[in-house]
Swiss-Prot record:
This is Subtilisin inhibitor-like protein 4. The record marks K76, L77 as: Reactive bond. It is found in: Secreted. Disulfide bonds join C38-C53, C74-C104. It comes from Streptomyces lavendulae. Its main location: secreted. It comes from the Bacteria. InterPro entries: Prot_inh_I16_SSI, Prot_inh_SSI_I16_CS, Subtilisin_inhibitor, Subtilisin_inhibitor-like_sf. GO terms for molecular function: serine-type endopeptidase inhibitor activity.
Amino acid sequence: APDAAPASLYAPSALVLTIGHGGAAATATPERAVTLTCAPTSSGTHPAASAACAELRGVGGDFAALKARDDVWCNKLYDPVVVTAQGVWQGQRVSYERTFGNSCERDAVGGSLFAF
């Protein structure tokens, strides 16, 4: 039997992103969730899929490499927000969780990625 042809020329990049209030994903109730597909084109329920995919491509899909913008100043009011990303980035499994001190700190790091 001939070898099966690959289903796509692109490695899959499909993620589910969530946001919730709390100190950890295990105890926080997800308040919002979106899907994000970055290959072969940007799509999903994310409101800014193209910009979010561009941010991820800029750090090679390494969520931990996302840094806070220098031009954003946030207060220190502690109201923890946890974000998660589960799925596949360029064929590799992704499981990411990060807790920010508040929504402003989340927005300063994620840019459009966590803006949903």
